[in-house]
């Protein structure tokens, strides 16, 4: 996902270099990251981009810090101002944990999704999100790893059936935690990135969030919460290949607007 340029700085992730969507038009970005040769336990990453359609600058900056310990313990501080799909939440990242291109939006998803679906609906579900975040990721043993995070920000509404420019803005603050439980699974760690070598045993994911939100037409904040569960399993069928499946379930507590609903992957 990165292009080496010199010993201490590399370009990437490469999906940030160029994008196209109906809100921004053609967007060109300059993403950079420090390398392990500069700091083994610290990574600085940032991107500045300009959209020719909305004529606006956007981007993000993040700091990753790894504690010098035998097991993985990392801290991430991040601020982003980017367009994202309103249907993708934090727990959804587990479903795509092994993908090289793991963003919510990139050039390929923009082009193919825009060609396949009604352009009006495609346009409406991408929203500009401005968010600050602090996240802790920890390994406790070879079976259990956890994440805990605090995020505060604002986002567009993103409901597909409503006119984009008439939709309200949502302000939110959220405390979340999740756990990943695996059994005898091999993990490959590189510079602030992990890949999983799945075996024939299931992987279990659980998550919970508690937060508050307010739309710009509401006088005060409301509380909400959610619980999520996912099971991933790869079954070796020998000469018949393999079967990969996911099971997902969850609960949302409180009266919530569209951006706080959970959207399951696949055709609906």
Task: Annotate the PLM regions.
Residues 41-43, 72-74, 145, 242-244:
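Membrane-spanning beta-strand positions in outer-membrane beta-barrel proteins
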Residues 1-51, 57-59, 89-96, 119-126, ...:
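Outer-membrane beta-barrel initiation region
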Residues 36-38, 67-71, 140-142, 183-185, ...:
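Outer-membrane beta-barrel strand-turn architecture
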Residues 74-122, 192-197, 203-268:
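C-terminal outer-membrane beta-barrel translocator/porin domains of Gram-negative envelope proteins
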Residues 47-51, 66, 78-82, 139, ...:
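Outer-membrane beta-barrel pore domains and translocons
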Residues 42-67, 223-235:
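Short secondary-structure subsegments characteristic of cysteine-rich extracellular domains
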């Amino acid at each position: 996902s990165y292009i080496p340029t010199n010993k201490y700085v590399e370009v990437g992730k490469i999906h940030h270099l160029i994008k196209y969507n109906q809100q921004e038009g053609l967007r060109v970005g300059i993403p950079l990251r420090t390398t392990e040769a500069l700091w083994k336990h610290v990574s600085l990453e940032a991107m500045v981009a300009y959209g020719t359609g909305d004529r606006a600058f956007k981007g993000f900056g993040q700091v990753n810090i790894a504690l010098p310990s035998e097991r993985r313990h990392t801290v991430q501080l991040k601020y982003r101002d980017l367009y994202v799909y309103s249907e993708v939440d934090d727990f959804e990242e587990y479903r795509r944990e092994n993908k090289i291109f793991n963003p919510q939006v990139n050039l390929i998803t923009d082009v193919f999704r825009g060609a396949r679906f009604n352009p009006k609906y495609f346009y409406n579900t991408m929203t500009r999100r401005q968010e600050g975040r602090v996240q802790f990721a920890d390994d406790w043993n070879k079976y259990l790893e956890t994440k805990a995070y605090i995020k505060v920000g604002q986002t567009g509404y993103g409901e597909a059936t409503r006119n984009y420019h008439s939709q309200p803005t949502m302000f939110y603050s959220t405390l979340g935690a999740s756990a990943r439980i695996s059994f005898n699974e091999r993990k490959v760690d590189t510079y602030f990135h992990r890949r999983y070598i799945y075996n024939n045993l299931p992987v279990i994911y659980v998550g919970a969030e508690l937060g508050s939100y307010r739309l710009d037409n509401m006088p005060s904040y409301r509380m909400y919460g959610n619980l999520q569960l996912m099971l991933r399993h790869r079954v070796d069928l020998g000469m018949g290949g393999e079967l990969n499946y996911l099971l997902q379930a969850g609960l949302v507590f409180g009266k919530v607007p569209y951006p706080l609903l959970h959207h399951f992957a696949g055709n609906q």
